[in-house]
């Protein structure tokens, strides 16, 4: 019997997102519930312990003990892996952002596609029977039901904890103007681009081609600009290079993603965004001025497909090139309240000051229907079902073909006759890798290969004839 007054939390390798803010709410306002943070790395565990909270590694004996007793597991995504000791726990999925982009089952290409399909096969029982999912408005409810295959009776309707937490949280020094030795009347802007599926490590040079000109504009308009890069884009070569050169520049700050940026939303005067859901979170948190820097809008495979019309469901001055981006800083005080109110209603209609309490109460009251059983999915090896392999190991088929080559009157190269059992899987791996990396070139999103392509590759590498 699981204890609904023991909760465990995780947000990947960081202490942030909706799980972090609900965790803090439990700590400060719900003394009847005992919260624990589970971690994948010692670094994250040690960081949270330094803040004074209980944290354990997933693989530790203590986590196994707590996890086997806990009643609620708070996450911000549809998890790929559930530890065995979590079987039967209520999964409270707070997600990680509203918005226009396709997610989960709506993703049809990119490196995540295969992983998404796999986890929905492996974890479908958990997703369907044990998971509660937070949505923030009727529009987002419809969106996530379709994208994430949700059951309506397992939906929680409220605002995000990271946007509607009742109070302030401070896990680091918020006085960034003092750190940069800038006067108090300095305005603060943030540039927060989203992850690009096709240009994760060569984006920054396209977005910011002239840092000197940017710094001059910031000086002239009395701005500090924060570069808040997506974690998957932080290794962008040009970004790292610019960071080294300008790290001591008083007008730019390269954000450390170890610090939760949401803690200083109330300090932001201007938010420059593109397709990231952080736009909606900043809007909900009271940011008054926005710009949309979308120089790559419409380019193929720049990011995932839109499930909703981007132009209709965002607001702020549109910048399609670097010059227009620079001009934003001199026009940052224009009134956008009417558009902000329109977007707020579309994306945050379920939110109010009681949102976090609604979430907690819904999780406490939820009882999974363990009698509901899903159909069993059977998977078969094609060699066993269609061909009838008689070898003990799969590689035995390749040894068999190799023996036939040695007996053949055809003059196969000596290397092939001695190493076909290795060449055959090498060729398959090579073709599969090519198909994964050539989606744009082939103009075909399929990544599964055919039998003949493997032998075409062997033929090409070893100069074989069709015979």
Describe the predicted segments one by one:
Residues 374-391:
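Asp-based phosphoryl-transfer active-site loop
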Residues 14-22, 27-28, 146-147, 157-242, ...:
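Conserved catalytic-core segment of nucleotide-activated headgroup transferases in glycan assembly
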Residues 34-50, 215-255:
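Catalytic donor nucleotide-activated moiety binding site of glycosyltransferases and closely related
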Residues 73-102, 258-302:
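A donor-sugar binding/catalytic signature common to diverse glycosyltransferases
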Residues 243-244, 277-350, 398:
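Catalytic binding pocket for nucleotide-activated donors in carbohydrate/polymer assembly enzymes
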Residues 392-442:
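Conserved phosphoryl-transfer catalytic core
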